[in-house]
Amino acid sequence: MPSVTLKSENLESEGPILEVHFLIPSELEKKYIEEKKPIPEPVIIKSLIDTGASACVIQKEIPEKLGLEPMGVTKINTPSSKEHECYQYFIRMVIPSHNLIYEGAFIAAPLEGQNISCLIGRDVLKSGILIYIGYANQFTLSLL
């Protein structure tokens, strides 16, 4: 099971943050290659592992930069709003240095006033292991 272990001097205040790359889905990439279309460059962002988020959330600019169309609409609840409608996108998320890959649905919603552009939620964590060692300012994420 591929995993990534990171240390952070500010783990308590910032949380478990890691750099991830967003790419078009692998099936779409195959289609682009067959059609000799240019493949969009990866969108590289900071992401927070959030056990309080039931699903992964990304800033809406990410799928726009990749030229993706929404696959549907879903409703989310946040601490400040209820049943807020948001687009869902099928995207590939990669942590290239550790060969961690997740391909699935991401909800596009505002993540303003933060130094992150993605929340990695329990829909990803259900396929992995998260170890948070607070006293060592360290966390490990493993994904199937």
Where are the regions a protein language model picked out?
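Pepsin/retropepsin-fold aspartyl endopeptidases
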Residues: 1-144
